[in-house]
Design a protein with these regions (language model features):
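C-terminal motif of bacterial Sec signal peptides marking the signal peptidase cleavage site
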Residues: 4-7
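N-terminal export/targeting and maturation segments
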Residues: 9-71, 75-80
Length: 148
């Protein structure tokens, strides 16, 4: 399968008004708010003390987005969209792009999110070994989040 970037839409980092006592409740709220299910979650990753959920939204051209589950000083959890939504589509175009998106969490930590179909190109772009990249088999995309 050959994939080409269709487009990315910037999301403002949105702090949810709803806080929850449990991590699971914040995730369930976020899934419901996005109109998606647990099956749409690509991965849950912890990097630099922050929890991220990478997910696809089939209602929005299977766009890939990231949420940060923030824990405040009182131990309450919130679902917050961070970064851009990137949509990929199948194409016969042989110019296959990769995406680098700088994201910032509610706690003001900065990260780079790398996403693309070519493992070698993405590893070079992210300055990591090929083995460090994660892979989404369903969408045939490699990805990694790195703290800046």
């Amino acid at each position: 399968m050959i994939i080409t970037l269709v487009g990315c839409q910037t999301n403002k980092t949105s702090q949810a008004n709803n806080t929850f006592l449990k991590y699971k409740s914040a995730v369930e709220y976020g899934l419901q708010d996005e109109g998606i299910t647990k099956d749409d979650i690509i991965d849950e990753i912890q990097v630099g003390g922050e929890q991220f959920i990478i997910f696809a939204n089939p209602n929005l051209s299977d766009s890939i987005a990231i949420a940060n589950i923030n824990v405040d000083k009182n131990g309450a959890y919130t679902w917050n969209l961070v970064g851009s939504r990137c949509a990929f589509a199948m194409s016969s175009n042989h110019s296959i792009p990769s995406v680098k998106d700088e994201i910032q969490t509610i706690s003001r930590k900065k990260f780079n999110f790398y996403l693309g179909p070519d493992k070698t190109k993405l590893a070079l772009m992210a300055d990591v070994d090929n083995e460090e990249l994660k892979y989404d088999e369903k969408r045939e995309l490699y990805y990694i989040i790195r703290e800046i």
